[in-house]
Amino acid sequence: YQYQGKFFQLSDVLGVDKEVGFTLSHDKYNTVDPNHFIVEDIEGEIDFGEGMASIYGHGENYQIIRQHKEFAQLVTNTYGAGRSVYLAGLPYSPQNCRLLLRAIYWAAAKEDEMKKYYVDNVNAEVAAFEAVGKIVVINNSLDALDTHLYVEGNLREKLRLAPMEMRWLDI
């Protein structure tokens, strides 16, 4: 329920609030700007699961990236020197893992560091073990896949991975 006029007590930080019937007379102009770092390599629709109804953008610095039936599903906001990301729901899928990874990098204002060790296929992942000079690229799918491995933001190599393969490489 609402407390002090807000459903989400951190609505100023999150950039969203929930309509519960007390602010129906207020105009809510939810315009979508789908271009954002968080969704740059997301293909197709994002699965928000059951999601959340009646969520609208709130404040001065929010950006609605995705919405459904005029209700916000993915919203970014700047607040003071910080950033926040609101997701209406996020069931597990490889694409949602990538979405969450990108959201974390954006919220931390570390977008430039995301491709220190990076693969561009959402069904693959990479881990670096700098102390021993190794990288592992993992195919998380039951199908063969192609991916590009980036190190320090530069394309290192193109890889073809067998289903569920883990490939070790030298850094």
State each model region's role.
Residues 1-171:
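A conserved amphipathic helix/loop scaffold
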